[in-house]
């Protein structure tokens, strides 16, 4: 950790973009620890209202005067560099006043300092796996602190300042900022090219995960998914380097299905999913914890029945990672397994919104081709029993990602029966001439019907006109598409009333 971070004064923290999922969680923990918090954002939100109720001073809109919301100038300003432009008047004013401007990850690194850090990294699955780990540790009688990119359904929050010694958090690789952390347990769920607007090359993206692994504290664990080629390759390279005379101060272990573990024999498997069965209550798996866990948990080795309520093998893999990491931290394995069984999900991760006219409506945050494919495969498991179809309402996120992965998005969306494509949600990016969602649609398999509806206000009525009893509608994407799930239900209500 840099000398600047070591000496950072957190007594008065001003957060630019305080309403975001990651920023609001850090604000909540800072408030719980007794620091003064102020901030600003472009629009009102439930997160902002909750933070105000907890004592934060927050202004909607950005202006230099916001720096004085708490009555005096802040000791530090925090922002998300990816989301907030550097000419923001509050950032400019802070620099002119000599106030340190830090990233969210820098502040999280400070909050992690006196805790045992259990960090979840990977291209996909961070939020779900982090949330499962929290549920597991809470069920084991611990009170972990946590900072998550989504809101836990049961807890109704995305962050908590716990009394226990463990801090569970997502480690976001999108701008390399997770290199600020020093975890005891680091899980890597998968590594696939993403965020190429920042990293430029696939090799640079993969290399940042190797650097992250070397941030693990001596005696800690790197836990990798062996069903994913990218994370398995990371483990294999580290182990090979150790065998060639570059010893590692941490232990590398894997988790995955029996097939995944068998495919990478050089990586010692610590958690093996030996069988799975889809039931009305969810997916039930036989999870074997091997002798590898005895390095940290002498009594935990054995085979357990693991129930995961949320559909999809990707969720079973996430659950296995959460179990393994929790057990390596010393949590009681039986209580951990029970905690996973009671986990009921995270907002915007295969989140059920309702049923109208025998049409189920779900919402999911998936915005990378692999995530889209995983959620549609999970939906297929559920919809087959109903005899209906999958109607995917997809809003691509970022022009750069749409251009880089148009083929892969088309392949993933071809798993649906009907696709409704919205205009691209550009977020921080400017529109690119000639690039819209049709570059995906034109490559979707001929067996899947698709329509392009650029008028956001018309999408819910378009969807209502396409669905049939027994169908499942999934609104998918990281942008404003989430607003449509309830709108579609209302549109179906209107149709039901005639």
UniProtKB/Swiss-Prot annotation:
Any GO BP: regulation of cell shape
- Give the location in the cell: Cytoplasm
Catalytic activity reported: UDP-N-acetyl-alpha-D-muramate + L-alanine + ATP = UDP-N-acetyl-alpha-D-muramoyl-L-alanine + ADP + phosphate + H(+)
Enzyme class, spelled out: ligase
Recite the UniProt keywords alphabetically: ATP-binding, Cell cycle, Cell division, Cell shape, Cell wall biogenesis/degradation, Cytoplasm, Ligase, Nucleotide-binding, Peptidoglycan synthesis
| Pathway(s) it belongs to | Cell wall biogenesis; peptidoglycan biosynthesis
Q: NCBIfam families recorded for this chain?
A: murC (TIGR01082)
The entry's function note states: Cell wall formation.
- Record-given protein name: UDP-N-acetylmuramate--L-alanine ligase
Which organism is this protein's natural source? Corynebacterium jeikeium (strain K411)
Higher taxonomy: Bacteria, Bacillati, Actinomycetota, Actinomycetes, Mycobacteriales
By which gene is this protein encoded? Answer: murC
